[in-house]
A protein has these predicted regions:
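Active-site groove signature of glycoside hydrolases
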Residues: 121-140
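Generic structural signal for well-ordered alpha-helices
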Residues: 5, 46, 69, 73, ...
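Conserved, mostly hydrophobic/aromatic
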Residues: 8, 20, 42, 57, ...
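N-terminal binding-site loop/beta-alpha segment at the start of enzyme catalytic domains
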Residues: 1-86
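Active-site mouth loops of central-metabolism enzymes
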Residues: 27-40, 99-114, 139
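Acidic (Asp/Glu)-rich catalytic clusters
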Residues: 10, 75-86, 121-125, 155, ...
């Protein structure tokens, strides 16, 4: 199947207008999990999406405390190199080792970003990451300029091809842009949550920054399968 393509901002990366989000593939057992998942079913879903023309997968180090990246890595390892999709992942969320259900600390220090990228490369089984994103703004006192400078160094070193942010405000985007161009922005956006459409998305359009929204189906609420019965049957560790 031939899907429509778009260039991701000025990065030169061409992506399909539909991608594969692997938050749920991380499974349960952590603060924002989707309950128990079948890894083999997740891999089959990835393979089905790629065979249908999707050319990128989005994941994050925090999803399942690294498990989502491992599942994506398994899926990639079973594909011929020429058929593998682009890989996008995120950093900057530090889980509590004593309590996996405690919301992770939003931490984007240069040292932690460096640790996270190496872990992600290993779990994904890739030599570089096509798009590396700061998941949330730092809450530990690290200036965003320091975080963004480290992201730029990862590009210069060839560990990542493009860099982006998720959940950033216009003010933070402006500060990043003064250090190095923001290749991509990933805000929440759906028929229910439209706030980004009047704030950060116009900023991105004006600055040549690509936009990949997350939760466009509002975590399942906008699908025709999200019934009262399904909600009642959800696992206790499904954050929804």
């Amino acid at each position: 199947m031939k899907l429509n393509m778009r260039r991701l901002g000025t990065s030169g990366i061409e992506i399909t207008t539909v991608g594969f989000g692997s938050w749920a593939a991380g499974g349960g057992g952590w603060a924002f999990g989707w309950g128990p998942q079948d890894d083999d079913a997740s891999i089959r879903a990835i393979e089905r999406a790629v065979s249908g023309g999707v050319n990128w997968i989005d994941t994050a180090a925090i999803y399942g405390l690294g498990h989502s990246e491992e599942v994506v890595g398994r899926a990639l390892s079973g594909m011929p190199a020429a058929d593998r999709p682009l890989v996008f992942t995120k950093c900057g969320m530090d889980p509590d080792p004593a309590d996996s259900y405690r919301p992770p600390t939003r931490k984007a220090s240069p040292a932690f970003i460096r640790i996270e990228v190496e872990r992600s490369l290993r779990r994904l089984g890739v030599e570089w990451i096509d798009l590396y994103q700061i998941h949330w703004p730092d809450e530990t006192g690290v200036p965003v300029e320091d975080s963004w400078g480290e992201m730029g160094r990862l590009v210069d070193e060839g560990k990542v091809r493009a860099i982006g942010v998720s959940n950033f405000s216009v003010e933070l985007l402006e500060r990043c842009e003064r250090v190095r161009h923001v290749d991509s922005l990933q805000p929440p956006f759906s028929l229910i949550h439209r706030g980004s459409g009047s704030t950060v998305i116009p900023w991105a359009a004006a600055h040549g920054t690509g936009v990949i929204v997350y939760s466009p189906m509002a975590s399942g609420i906008l699908t025709d399968s999200f019934s009262r019965e399904r909600v009642e049957a959800m696992a206790e560790d499904d954050w929804r």
